[in-house]
Design a protein with these regions (language model features):
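Short, glycine-biased loop/turn motifs at secondary-structure junctions and
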Residues: 1-110, 115, 123-168
């Protein structure tokens, strides 16, 4: 799918799901990186609406660009000190390590099953959705905050981990 088609298809899907007028008017003609930036900036909308689908992401986005932006779908993920935002969609498995002064917002979705190891002075915010399973290890002065969205996800912790259930 060409850049213009991909952007137009995603815009039309988003509008049909209730994208606000401001985002619609400011959409522009983004390339894949621009579309990924929109996805990460509007992650709450995307998660709530199931948009775009995992199949769509896998079929239309370059895996290297997704990985550079810490977005994974149905993959084994072994990473250390990911920055900013990380999104694990579908059936991801793996281990994420955070140490030193690293910070990250992580979204673990669908049927993903990951271990997240936070140590030293890291600060990690973890959102768990759907049927995802997380095992979270905290040590040292690491600050770890877990937000549980739904009744079907599983969160296991070891160490000082703050947990909250989503109000939505």
């Amino acid at each position: 799918m060409k850049k213009e088609e991909l952007s137009r298809t995603l815009l039309n899907q988003a509008v049909s799901l209730g994208l606000c007028a401001q985002w619609t008017e400011q959409w522009g003609e983004p390339d894949q990186q621009g579309l990924i930036d929109k996805y990460l900036h509007g992650i709450d909308f995307c998660i709530e609406k199931g948009y775009p689908t995992n199949t769509f992401i896998k079929e239309h986005f370059d895996k290297d660009i997704l990985h550079r932006n810490n977005i994974f779908v149905d993959e084994d993920v072994q990473a250390r000190n990911m920055k900013h935002i990380a999104v694990l969609n579908g059936n991801c498995k793996g281990t994420l390590l955070f140490d030193g002064f690293s910070t990250c917002d992580i979204y673990v979705r669908h049927d993903s099953d990951v271990t997240i190891d936070c140590s030293k002075f890291s600060k990690v915010f973890i959102n768990v959705y759907d049927r995802a399973k997380t095992h979270i290890l905290q040590s040292g002065a690491a600050s770890v905050y877990v937000y549980i969205h739904g009744e079907d996800c599983i969160v296991e912790t070891d160490g000082d981990v703050m947990q909250r259930k989503s109000q939505m």
